[in-house]
Regions:
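Short glycine/serine/threonine-biased micro-segments
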Residues: 16, 23, 43, 48-49, ...
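Catalytic phosphate/nucleotide-handling subdomain of diverse soluble enzymes
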Residues: 33-63
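Active-site-adjacent helical/loop segments in soluble small-molecule enzymes
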Residues: 1-41
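Short, glycine-/Ser/Thr-/acidic-enriched flexible segments
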Residues: 5-6, 26, 51-53, 82, ...
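A conserved regulatory-domain signal marking ACT and ACT-like small-molecule sensing domains
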Residues: 55-156
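A short, charged, Gly/Pro-tolerant segment at domain boundaries
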Residues: 26-27, 46-52, 150-154
């Protein structure tokens, strides 16, 4: 069962039913949701437990659930080293339903371009193609990080 699916289940149980579960307690429900067709017309028991959950990690759990749901994306974005580049990125690339949730940039002197790590939350997962097309069209696209788990671990 993917880690993101477990995080999604933890959040659903908390938000819908007020149940605080630990990751191990959510695995059974996650597996049942993913493979429900294998359990049709069968009796299934699932143990739900929550004693080993640190509630302060909810933001991390939410982040991983959003990445798993294809709603949160991280990029290396190439910015031209000139005034107005960030404004151009926001005006020409970011959609009205997109939200920049992470931005890390260090200005470098004597370079034509510099890079920023940008996290963007989408309202709809289908908007990812449009977002990356706009980045490429305006020359901002550097690299997509969601498919690089080792790099992504540094961010979430």
């Amino acid at each position: 069962v993917p880690e993101g699916k477990i995080c999604q289940t933890i959040l659903e149980l908390y938000n819908k039913d007020g149940i605080v579960v630990e990751p191990a307690g959510a695995i059974g429900i996650s597996a049942l949701e993913m493979y429900h067709e294998k359990f049709t017309k069968k009796n299934v028991g699932i143990l739900i437990c929550g004693g080993n959950n640190d509630i302060t990690r909810m933001s991390e759990i939410k982040e991983r659930a959003l990445v798993y749901s294809n709603l949160k994306h991280y990029f290396i974005v190439k910015f031209p080293q000139r005034k107005g580049a960030l404004k151009e990125f926001v005006n020409n690339v970011i959609g009205e339903n997109d939200d920049i949730t992470f931005f890390e940039y260090v200005k470098k002197n004597n370079r034509d371009y510099t890079s920023a790590i940008v996290g963007i939350e989408l309202k709809f997962s289908k908007d990812l193609n449009h977002l990356t097309q706009k980045m490429k069209e305006f020359g901002f696209f550097g690299e997509y990080l969601n498919d690089k788990p080792e790099t992504l671990r540094f961010l979430i």
